[in-house]
Amino acid sequence: MKFTALLAGAAVALTAGFASAETRITYKSAKSTSSYYQMAVQIAEAMKEGSGGDIIVTVEESQGSVQNVMEARARGGDYVFTTPPVLVRLAQGGKAMFEGKGDPKFDEIRALFPIPSLTMHFVMGADSGVNDFADLEGKTVLIGKGSFGAREGAKYLGLFGLEGKVTLADVELSNAVPALKNGQIDGFVTAGSFPAPNVIEAAASTGVKVLSLSDEQIKQTKRAKLVIPAGTYAGQTEDITTTSLPVVAFTTTAMSDEAAYQLTKTYWEQKDAMGAAAAWWNGVDSDLMQHITGKIHPGAAKYYKEIGWALTDAQM
């Protein structure tokens, strides 16, 4: 009887030990059809694999980054979400889409790690005769509707003196490749982590030229400079210089230091394996840390200090 009781006690202790070791995370991502949702699923799988099952991530669909930030007001210590850092700054300042929606909880948002950036692609048909932005005049271009890429594409046309000089095709971005194939458009604009699936398809099926931006044009956009290496797309013999909007995984101060440490450590240790399965992870490296302009969670900061990565005063 005593032996049975001891076994039962040991079983309870073991169960308690496993329960305390397991970290459950809710990861708020993007629309289920987006590349960022695919990334979230890949992160969930990598966390489970890298932690031996101790980190369990549940991916939640989202309508976008603004929703992700807004939900930080009410979520607990298990909440991780993705957004460009600029939206966190706007939320904390009660500006733009967050005007009149300020909340002290926004000041508790903390960064964990960068994920692949939103990368601008101006994709032109190989036979369109377009080699730079000046050549876009008189052409028909699809920029889509309502997305970051559509807003950014329209903004760039205005900045570069092309507003009203380019015909904007009334076609959904999902139909960009067929429209390019049948000559309905001369090119399209898309924003997504490289290599972008629709650009891969277009490059392989019809041949394309992805336009580069000059340093002066990049300065005009007020976005980060990003280089897409030669060979990323079929027929691409030179680097493409373009712009990007950094995207970061955030949590809040409600998350424990240990959970933030383990999440960050496992993410970076699994990044190469993720990159072997999906090339967009290969563009993530320590250089992206400079785009985290706000505070980093103390648990994540502990990991970065361990591996010798310098953090700025603003990040601490």
Describe the function of each predicted region.
Residues 38-73, 235-237:
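Extracytoplasmic small-molecule ligand-binding "clamshell" domains
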Residues 175, 181-182, 192-201, 205, ...:
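An extracytoplasmic/periplasmic, membrane-proximal ligand-sensing/linker region
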